[in-house]
């Protein structure tokens, strides 16, 4: 809804092509006056791509196990204890306090304190007594502490380096406000919660307050700010040359490494979210990204009494932009240290970072408008829509490739989600084409309008149709759902509406705005479509909520039907929640004779039989590996039951109901904004600046829905990241294919395999290997990849699931274990692997086993290893 046709009559002539007729003054900053622009908006988009591109690289490195969570801690320590303190120290030393606008700092402090205490009080009133104080301590910190240095500073530098370079120094002054004045209050609440949980009567009130203040003083950022201010006066704002080069070397490494580390910390944070967590996250993110920016801006407008009107306006805009910065990773560190509200805080950090990018982009565009002239506004919305459509289309292509390659599009509700993604893709393509259609090409405009608005109305309707299908899935389990009717409705009704609009509507010839191409009739049609979709989606989700027990939504990583962890979304966690092995793979076996695989065409094949759902014994059995070693060494995927069940597991996967519910909730928010825009235009003749902001939000939502879909469905590592990693390794190292492991392996892999065979292999076999049926009357000793990962962590051979996967992959490369069909590398999933027979040439090294680990083995032998959720 990019319409400004309701502005005063003298400004209604927007028929000209904005890209050709706008003057230069409008093109640069959209400033109709002769004043210079307050910020360099042309550098914003590249800065956002730079920052979030590095974050994405870090995420891919963590998801692909190039850097494990344990290894990432070293990078985090370097960033927080060396790079950032050096950067802070130098900038505090050279800071010119005479140029600081202290009223700006007071305004930010009041705004942050207001949000902090509002969130704190509401949490104390609403939260359950069991965890009231921990929530009241961490949630306000979440809502007020921004990622000032890693994400904020590069963006401020891009916007204000050429116009107001002194604004960069405010980052170093504003950041300690939260750390020194507000965070101690939150820490004290957390210490009170810890005291209540432990019932430690000896811990008095003074000690609790002291511990809270001590945590603040231990923060390197706070410590270095005080040291830097002291040396500011001692050195007279001049850093010695021999020290300056050293500080520059550390400080210059901060930005890239901090953003990369941020991506690493985002891996697997969205996990096992319950229904109640959705509400909490939405409220916290709203407080951080919407309430705080507005309060910061209003406080500066109210308290700043600067002489320059331009500087006053620019400061208030800067305050708003500062408030939009996402949550700092340090909040997640605080939650982990206290072991309180970790899931909500870490998940919120990821979501706020993801959501803040489009908000910062739109906010910066809005802040460049000194007047309400409709021409530059319409031009800006056209360009924002075009830019977002390009990136969104790429995200949608990625997400659709995930659904196609995983074959989830064949099952519900992913079949309907695929239609939604296709409609969103057509919307982006239509917007891109609309941008190039000439004003006088009426036929071209009509054709593109039909393409654009048929698909846009389809995205509106698919939100409601997807919600009602989720309700039917939840209500009727696997009962047949009228998929054909839903698909026909999702595409047919929008096409019918656009057809009626073409026949009955009157073309508004003086507008190039697609949202007002057919004037009032189009706005009414859009409003009715939005209202119906919101009504259907809202009723469906409420009914779905009533039919489900409180908190019974499955986690992001758990399947409702199989209780299997969904591939690609489990965190590197030290103590994951227990998940049972799929029922597909468990039962008793009446006969456990050696597999009677026969040799044919150079390959071993198990006898062809009808599929049997249950294949393994309920108790671990020590198989005769020398006897059936060749069993399933090259099982045919069309005849072996284990291979068939693997394929069924990989294809069926998870219905991902929680992800679809979250998708519907986020889309409903955008539908409400569009409906508000339509109603505002129909009933209000004086739109004002808030209406303009709403128009920008609607444009970003309509053509940026791909970001939401990508964030929810586009991050499957096994279909995109790992294949790319394997291909890159193949090209880099010129390796053989996975089936040919005859090439020499590295000495490190040899040593790992020899140590495992000599000290750990037999115990591992006794603990995790089970007899599983692979033929009519045959069985083989196999184990699941996730079971080996759990065992490696249990005995201390790996510190986390990421390192365990690397260890298992070394065993595969060294020929110690092998996938039953040799199709997959080692994965932390319910895929079947087997131990290969010991090679005579493999002599164990002379290494003394650790006594403590041997004692640990004795304990493990008397107890079965716990079942952990796989890291996939």
From Swiss-Prot:
GO terms for cellular component: lysosomal membrane. Residues 759-837 form the DEP domain. One of its GO terms (molecular function) is cholesterol binding. Cholesterol binds at residues 45, 59, 268-270, 659. Cholesterol binds at the interface between the PIN-like transporter region and the GPCR domain; these two regions likely coordinate to sense cholesterol and regulate mTORC1 activation. Gene3D superfamilies: Rhodopsin 7-helix transmembrane proteins (1.20.1070.10), Winged helix-like DNA-binding domain superfamily/Winged helix DNA-binding domain (1.10.10.10). GO terms for biological process: cellular response to amino acid starvation; cellular response to cholesterol; intracellular signal transduction; negative regulation of BMP signaling pathway; positive regulation of TORC1 signaling; transmembrane transport. Glycans are attached at residues 11, 17, 31, 311, 383. The keyword Chaperone does not apply. The gene is GPR155. Residues 382-719 are annotated as: GPCR. It is a multi-pass membrane protein. Homodimer; via the transporter region and DEP domain. Interacts with the GATOR1 complex; preventing interaction between GATOR1 and KICSTOR; interaction is disrupted upon cholesterol starvation. This is Lysosomal cholesterol signaling protein. Cholesterol-binding protein that acts as a regulator of mTORC1 signaling pathway. Acts as a sensor of cholesterol to signal cholesterol sufficiency to mTORC1: in presence of cholesterol, binds cholesterol, leading to disruption of the interaction between the GATOR1 and KICSTOR complexes and promotion of mTORC1 signaling. Upon cholesterol starvation, GPR155/LYCHOS is unable to perturb the association between GATOR1 and KICSTOR, leading to mTORC1 signaling inhibition. Binds indole-3-acetic acid and may play a role in tryptophan metabolism. SMART domains: DEP. Residues 62-81, 128-135, 191-215, 267-275, 339-348, 405-416, 462-482, 544-662, 715-872 are cytoplasmic. Residues 3-372 are annotated as: PIN-like transporter.
């Amino acid at each position: 809804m990019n319409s400004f046709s309701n502005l005063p009559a003298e400004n209604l002539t927007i028929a000209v092509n904005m890209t050709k007729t706008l003057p230069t003054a409008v093109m640069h900053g959209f400033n109709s006056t002769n004043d210079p622009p307050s910020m360099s908006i042309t550098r914003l988009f590249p800065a956002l791509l730079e920052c979030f591109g590095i974050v994405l690289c870090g995420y891919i490195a963590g998801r692909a196990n190039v850097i494990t969570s344990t290894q990432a801690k070293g990078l985090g320590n370097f960033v927080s204890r060396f790079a950032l303190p050096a950067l802070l120290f130098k900038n505090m030393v050279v800071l010119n306090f005479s140029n600081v606008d202290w009223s700006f700092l007071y305004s930010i402090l009041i705004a942050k304190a207001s949000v902090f205490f509002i969130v704190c009080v509401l949490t104390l009133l609403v939260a359950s007594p069991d965890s009231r104080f921990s929530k009241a301590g961490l949630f306000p910190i979440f809502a007020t502490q921004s990622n000032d240095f890693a994400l904020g500073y590069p963006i401020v530098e891009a916007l204000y380096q050429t116009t107001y370079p002194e604004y960069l120094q405010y980052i170093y002054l504003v950041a300690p406000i939260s750390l020194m004045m507000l965070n101690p209050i939150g820490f004290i609440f957390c210490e009170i919660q810890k005291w209540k949980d432990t019932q430690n009567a000896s811990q008095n009130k003074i000690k609790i307050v002291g511990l809270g203040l001590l945590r603040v003083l231990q923060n390197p950022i706070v410590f270095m700010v005080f040291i830097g201010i002291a040396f500011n006066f001692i050195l007279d704002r001049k850093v010695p040359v021999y020290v300056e080069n050293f500080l520059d070397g550390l400080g210059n490494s901060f930005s890239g490494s901090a953003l990369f580390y941020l991506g690493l910390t985002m891996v697997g944070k969205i996990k096992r979210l319950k229904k109640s967590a959705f509400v909490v996250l939405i409220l916290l993110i709203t407080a951080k990204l919407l309430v705080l920016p507005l309060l910061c801006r209003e406080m500066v407008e109210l308290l700043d009494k600067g002489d320059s009107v331009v500087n006053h306006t620019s400061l208030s805009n800067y305050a708003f932009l500062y408030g939009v910065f996402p949550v700092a990773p340090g909040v997640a560190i605080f939650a982990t240290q206290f072991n309180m509200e970790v899931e909500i805080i870490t998940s919120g950090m990821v979501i706020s970072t993801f959501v803040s990018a489009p908000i910062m982009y739109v906010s910066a565009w809005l802040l460049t408008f000194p007047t309400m002239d409709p021409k530059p506004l319409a031009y800006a919305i056209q360009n924002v829509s075009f830019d977002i459509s390009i990136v969104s289309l790429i995200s949608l292509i990625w997400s659709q490739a995930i659904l196609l390659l995983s074959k989830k599009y064949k099952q519900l509700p992913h079949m309907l989600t695929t239609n939604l993604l296709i409609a969103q893709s057509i919307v982006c393509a239509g917007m891109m084409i609309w941008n190039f259609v000439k004003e006088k090409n009426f036929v071209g405009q009509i054709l593109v309008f039909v393409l654009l608005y048929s698909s846009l109305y389809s995205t509106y309707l698919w939100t409601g149709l997807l919600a009602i299908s989720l309700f039917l899935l939840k209500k009727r389990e696997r009962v047949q759902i009228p998929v054909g009717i839903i698909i026909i409705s999702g595409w047919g009704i929008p096409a019918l509406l656009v057809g009626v609009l073409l026949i009955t509507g009157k073309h508004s010839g003086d507008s190039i705005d697609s949202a007002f191409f057919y004037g009032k009739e189009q706005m009414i049609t859009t409003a009715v479509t939005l209202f119906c979709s919101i009504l259907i989606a809202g009723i469906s989700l409420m009914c779905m909520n009533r039919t489900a027990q409180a908190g019974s939504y499955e986690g992001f990583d758990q399947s409702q039907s199989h209780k299997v962890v969904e591939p690609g979304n489990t965190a590197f966690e030290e103590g994951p929640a227990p998940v049972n092995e799929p029922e597909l793979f468990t039962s008793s076996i009446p006969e456990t004779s050696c597999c009677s695989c026969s040799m044919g065409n150079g390959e071993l094949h198990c006898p062809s039989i009808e599929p049997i759902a249950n294949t393994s014994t309920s108790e671990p059995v020590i198989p005769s590996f020398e006897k059936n070693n060749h069993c399933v060494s090259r099982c045919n995927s069309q005849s072996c039951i284990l291979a068939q069940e693997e394929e069924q597991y990989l294809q069926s996967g998870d219905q991902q109901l929680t992800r679809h519910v979250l998708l519907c909730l986020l889309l409903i928010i955008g539908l409400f904004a569009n409906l508000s825009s339509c109603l505002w235009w129909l009933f209000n003749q004086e739109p004002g600046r808030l209406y303009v902001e709403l128009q920008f939000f609607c444009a970003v939502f309509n053509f940026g829905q791909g970001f939401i879909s990508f964030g929810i469905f586009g991050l499957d590592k096994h279909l995109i990241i790992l294949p790319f990693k394997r291909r890159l390794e193949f090209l880099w190292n010129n390796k053989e294919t996975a089936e040919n492991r005859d090439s020499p392996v590295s000495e490190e892999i040899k040593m790992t395999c020899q140590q495992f065979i000599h000290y750990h292999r037999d115990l591992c076999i006794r603990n995790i290997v089970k007899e599983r049926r692979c033929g009519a009357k045959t069985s083989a000793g196999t184990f699941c990849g996730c079971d080996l990962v759990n065992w490696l962590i249990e005995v201390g051979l790996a510190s986390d699931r990421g390192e365990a996967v690397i260890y298992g992959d070394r065993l595969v490369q060294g020929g110690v274990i092998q996938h039953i069909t040799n199709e997959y590398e080692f994965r932390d999933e319910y895929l079947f692997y087997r131990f290969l027979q010991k090679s005579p040439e493999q002599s164990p090294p002379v290494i003394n086993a650790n006594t403590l680990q041997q004692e640990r083995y004795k304990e493990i032998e008397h107890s079965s290893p716990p079942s952990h959720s796989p890291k996939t």
